C-alpha cells in the first residue's frame, strides 16, 4: 500500500495535467474512484487544477440513491461542483458505459472541463487484456487501455494506470454488490479466471500488462517505420507486401472508430482495395469506400444526401422530361416505342421521384427494400442519387438506376391497359 504522497511523487513527472486547469473526475463511489477523488482533492493546488465530480446513478441497486446522496453531501462540504445523471433504458454493461461517457462528454462541453479523469489501474488493464483475448480481439487491441487519449473537447486521463489495486490506500467507499454477479464477463474474469491464473503464475497480471506495453511499442514502431507511405495512394499501397498492407489498412481505419468492421468485413475490404476496381462500395453504418484510378478513401454518407427532393406527376396520354429521361404514358400498342417499355395495369397518374427511406419493390414472391437493392447490385453513390422511382396507386412499379430498370411483378390476372415508354435524353 502506498501513501498519496508516494503516488503523487510518481505521477508529477508524467505531467498529465500540464495543459489542464479544470478537470472532471468520474466517481462511482467504489474504492478506486474514491481514492482518485481524495487524491486529486488533496493535490489539486500542487497540480494547479480545479476539480469537479461526475456521478452516474445506474438505479440497479437499493444502495444507489444513498451513494448518490453521500457524494452530493461530500461535494457540498468540500465546495466541489457535482453533476449527476440517472441511467435510463434497458441495462447492460455496454448500455451503461455508453450512457456514462455520453454524460461525461456533455458535462465537459457545457462546463469547460478539458479533461476527464478515471480511476483505472493496472488490475483493470490486465482484466481488459484478458477479456479481449477471450473475445478473440485483434492484436492491436491487446495494447489495452491508454493512460491518455483524446476525449470530447480534451483528454481522458488515467493517472492510476501504472499502480495496482493493492497500492491504493484504504478509504471509505461503497461496495457494489453487482461486482460479484457472474453474469458479467468482467466479473468472471476478476473473480474467477484471474485468481486461478495467478495460482499458476503469481506475476500473471504484471505479465499481461507487459504484453500490453510491448504490443503498444510494436505498433508505434510500425507507424514510425511506415509514416512515409501514403496509405490511400493505390500505387504506394500495392507496392507493399500483403502483411504491411494488412496493418496499413488497420491504421487507416483507426480514423473511423464507429465503423467497427468485423474480421470478415475487414478481409473483404482489403481485397476490394487490392483488386482496385473503381467505384463506390458500401461497408456499413452509412460508410462507403470510394476507389478511383489513383487512390481510395472511406467516407460517411448521410442517407438523406442520397435523395434529391423533386418529383413530377405523369398523367395518362401525356409525356414529360424528368432528369435525363423522356417519359411517355400512352395507350397500349403492338409496337414498342421506347428504349424501355413498361406494361401498366392502371391509368392512374404516375409519380416520378427519388428513393425515400423505407421504399421497397415487390418481385412477386418476395419484396426488397430499394436501399438493399442498391447495395446488393453495387450501384455507385452517383447512380443512387440519380435513381428514379416510379409510383402508381401507392405502389412502386419501377426503379430506374444506372443502366438498369427493375419492374414490379404484376399479378397473374392483371390486364394491361397502357404502357410507359422511357428514352434516355442525349446530351449535347
Curated annotation (Swiss-Prot):
Comment on protein domains: The N-terminal region contains the highly conserved SGGXDS motif, predicted to be a P-loop motif involved in ATP binding.
InterPro entries per UniProt: Lysidine-tRNA-synth_C, Rossmann-like_a/b/a_fold, TilS/TtcA_N, tRNA_Ile_lys_synt, tRNA_Ile_lys_synt_N
Top-level EC class: ligase
GO terms (BP aspect): tRNA modification
HAMAP family hit by this protein: tRNA_Ile_lys_synt
GO MF term set: ATP binding; tRNA(Ile)-lysidine synthase activity
PANTHER family in alphabetical order: TRNA(ILE)-LYSIDINE SYNTHASE-RELATED
Cellular component aspect of the GO annotation: cytoplasm
Coiled-coil residue windows: none
Positions of ATP binding: 28-33
Protein name per UniProt: tRNA(Ile)-lysidine synthase
Location of this chain's protein in the cell: Cytoplasm
EC number: 6.3.4.19
Keywords (A to Z) from UniProt: ATP-binding, Cytoplasm, Ligase, Nucleotide-binding, tRNA processing
Amino acid at each position: 500500500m502506498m501513501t498519496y504522497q508516494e503516488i503523487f511523487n510518481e505521477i508529477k513527472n508524467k505531467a498529465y495535467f500540464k495543459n489542464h486547469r479544470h478537470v472532471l473526475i468520474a466517481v462511482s463511489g467504489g474504492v478506486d474512484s474514491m481514492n482518485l477523488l481524495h487524491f486529486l482533492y488533496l493535490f489539486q493546488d500542487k497540480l494547479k487544477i480545479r476539480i469537479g465530480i461526475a456521478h452516474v446513478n445506474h438505479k440497479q441497486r437499493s444502495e444507489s440513491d444513498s451513494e448518490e446522496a453521500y457524494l452530493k453531501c461530500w461535494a457540498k462540504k468540500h465546495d466541489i461542483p457535482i453533476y449527476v445523471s440517472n441511467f435510463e433504458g434497458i441495462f447492460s454493461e455496454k448500455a451503461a458505459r455508453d450512457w456514462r461517457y455520453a454524460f461525461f462528454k456533455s458535462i465537459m462541453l457545457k462546463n469547460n472541463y478539458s479533461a476527464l479523469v478515471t480511476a483505472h489501474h493496472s488490475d483493470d488493464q490486465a482484466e481488459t487484456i484478458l477479456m479481449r483475448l477471450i473475445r478473440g480481439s485483434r492484436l492491436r487491441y491487446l495494447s489495452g487501455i491508454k493512460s491518455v487519449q483524446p476525449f470530447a473537447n480534451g483528454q481522458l486521463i488515467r493517472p492510476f494506470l501504472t499502480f495496482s489495486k493493492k497500492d491504493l490506500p484504504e478509504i471509505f467507499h461503497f461496495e457494489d454488490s453487482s461486482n460479484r454477479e457472474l453474469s458479467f464477463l468482467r466479473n468472471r474474469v476478476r473473480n474467477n479466471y484471474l485468481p486461478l491464473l495467478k495460482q499458476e503464475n503469481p506475476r500473471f497480471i504484471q505479465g499481461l500488462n507487459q504484453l500490453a506495453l510491448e504490443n503498444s511499442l510494436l505498433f508505434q514502431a510500425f507507424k514510425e517505420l511506415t509514416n512515409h507511405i501514403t496509405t490511400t495512394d493505390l500505387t504506394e499501397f500495392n507496392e507493399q507486401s500483403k502483411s504491411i498492407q494488412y496493418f496499413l489498412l488497420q491504421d487507416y481505419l483507426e480514423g473511423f472508430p464507429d465503423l467497427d468492421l468485423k474480421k470478415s468485413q475487414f478481409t473483404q475490404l482489403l481485397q476490394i482495395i487490392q483488386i482496385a476496381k473503381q467505384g463506390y462500395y458500401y461497408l456499413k453504418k452509412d460508410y462507403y469506400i470510394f476507389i478511383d484510378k489513383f487512390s481510395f478513401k472511406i467516407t460517411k454518407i448521410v442517407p438523406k444526401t442520397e435523395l434529391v427532393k423533386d418529383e413530377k406527376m405523369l398523367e395518362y396520354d401525356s409525356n414529360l422530361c424528368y432528369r435525363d429521361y423522356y417519359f411517355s404514358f400512352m395507350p397500349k400498342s403492338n409496337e414498342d416505342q421506347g428504349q424501355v417499355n413498361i406494361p401498366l395495369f392502371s391509368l392512374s397518374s404516375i409519380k416520378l421521384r427519388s428513393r425515400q427511406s423505407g421504399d421497397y419493390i415487390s418481385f412477386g414472391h418476395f419484396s426488397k427494400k430499394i436501399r438493399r437493392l442498391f447495395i446488393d447490385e453495387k450501384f455507385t453513390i452517383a447512380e443512387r442519387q440519380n435513381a428514379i422511382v416510379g409510383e402508381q396507386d401507392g405502389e412502386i412499379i419501377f426503379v430506374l438506376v444506372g443502366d438498369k430498370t427493375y419492374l414490379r411483378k404484376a399479378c397473374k390476372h392483371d390486364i394491361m391497359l397502357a404502357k410507359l415508354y422511357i428514352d434516355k435524353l442525349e446530351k449535347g
